[in-house]
Amino acid sequence: MLVMQLLLPFLASTAAAAAAIDSTSSSNGSDHHGSSFQAECESFKAKINVTNANVHSVTYVPAGVNISMADNPSICGGDEDPITSTFAFCRIALNVTTSSKSQIFMEAWLPSNYSGRFLSTGNGGLGGCVKYDDMAYAAGYGFATVGTNNGHFGNNGVSFYQNTEVVEDFAYRALHTGVVVGKELTKNFYPQGYNKSYYLGCSTGGRQGWKSVQTFPDDFDGVVAGAPAFNFINLTSWGARFLTLTGDSSAETFVTETQWTAVHNEIIRQCDSLDGAKDGIIEDPDLCQPIIEALLCNATQSSTSGTCLTGAQVKTVNGVFSATYGLNGSFLYPRMQPGSELAAYSSYYSGTPFAYAEDWYRYVVFNNTNWDVATWTVQDAAIANAQDPYQISTWNGDLSPFQKKGGKVLHYHGMEDAIISSESSKVYYKHVADTMNLSPSELDSFYRFFPISGMAHCANADGPSAIGQGTGTFAGNNPQDNVLLAMVQWVEEGVAPDFVRGAKLNGSTVEYRRKHCKYPKRNRYVGPGSYTDENAWECV
């Protein structure tokens, strides 16, 4: 099978993996070794002729060395998290001018174990930073891989201030430009060009993947989009609203971190067993409608104990678990799903502004560096929605062009996401179904959505959340354990995933696995084995 022909250099520490690497390569790819590949790389700079581009460097990177982060500014982490190359590749760094007031920085990593496949990575937050870990992950599988800084360096919105060109890069242009340039470099470097084009991204990267599906359907054959920051304008308004609910730490409405722990424990008490198993994980938060009043302090209790809430605090918590509405009661954004309270505190409930919302309103909506999130109202949300620069909301429900060209989307979202409510993904799925007048079985031909229980924002948390979405979540090379390989199998072999199998990792050790259902089905424990037995669950 084509999927099993993908090379696995990052597993080369085992003899079995090393043997597999030596004995396999994509029949559509090219396997370069030693000095010939190095010579091809070192002579490639003179052959690059990309419009509006300034090539900084073309460097041969051998296997087994720390990859230089000289082009990664300190605002993006610099070299604090070095990556060791487990494969040889040709590294190209360049700037591409997108307007008289904007440019992107990008890199292309062209591996010696090329599989005949192209892949673009995405970004995160308001960034701003090349996702080098994702580039290493994809290039390790033999993809010619590109990544950009999304039009500016840094994970904040300062660069947007009075510069709509940088906003345009962030909305869509940086990724699309990187794809166009990256494909040109790939075709020029490898005589056979590329056969299929893929995308892998989460959060802002998830939104970027969906923007490509909606606006540039020919860019990719397969898109893996996690925890998308789509409905972007209303997402920022949702993030701004939390401070108006909680107040600062001195407000009577403020709920302390200790009290949020009590809230979380009560939610788990009420909702954990709704899926049939008491495992500390809420499989489907849709079923969880917590009665927070159960935590009201009685006559002998004090809210200062951290174990109970005042009436004002209960109102705050209920507000968090309520949808956000705008002028005239118009729906803006769904509630925060219950189960994510512990991680969400630092981002949303701590009595301080959510930085991304603050930056978007300051530097884009109002162009006022002194704007105060505490003053946010639904009128502000209406102003932001009326702008929606370059349709950054990324909410088009008509995916017909992508469907007709044969594209595939694998969409996933963690059910404990503390940054982007997982309910937003469910709302979008239904929006696509309604817009295209397609049932779930009809959507299945090109669009499949997998809610991942026990996953926080893009990765990790309490449950079996490692699904091969990146280096730190690698849990196997079977397509059912790896969303990137599942996408390759779907595109190239026509075998679509009916489930995504996640792993609960302890370091690199798999503690247990669970099959995550394809929406709109949900997982239910039916026994008779332990909840750690994947065969004790079924999709209903």
UniProtKB/Swiss-Prot annotation:
Glycosylation: residue positions: 28, 49, 66, 95, 113, 195, 234, 298, 328, 367, 506
Domain of life of the organism encoding this protein: Eukaryota
Disulfide bonds: 41-90, 76-129, 202-458, 271-288, 297-308, 517-539
Localisation: Secreted
Entries under InterPro entries matching the protein: AB_hydrolase_fold (IPR029058), Tannase/feruloyl_esterase (IPR011118)
Gene Ontology cellular component annotations, sorted alphabetically: extracellular region
Keywords from the UniProt entry: Calcium, Carbohydrate metabolism, Disulfide bond, Glycoprotein, Hydrolase, Metal-binding, Polysaccharide degradation, Secreted, Serine esterase, Signal, Xylan degradation
Positions contributing to Ca(2+) binding: 272, 275, 277, 279, 281
GO biological process: xylan catabolic process
Outcome reported for the amino acid change (mutating residue 458 to A): High decrease in catalytic activity
Keyword Methyltransferase: no
Catalytic activity: feruloyl-polysaccharide + H2O = ferulate + polysaccharide
GO molecular function: feruloyl esterase activity; metal ion binding
Signal peptide as annotated in the record: 1-18
Role played: Involved in degradation of plant cell walls. Hydrolyzes the feruloyl-arabinose ester bond in arabinoxylans as well as the feruloyl-galactose and feruloyl-arabinose ester bonds in pectin.
Further comment: The calcium ion seen in the crystal structure is located far from the active site and appears to have a role in stabilization of the lid domain.
UniProt protein name: Probable feruloyl esterase B-1
Protein source organism: Aspergillus oryzae (strain ATCC 42149 / RIB 40)
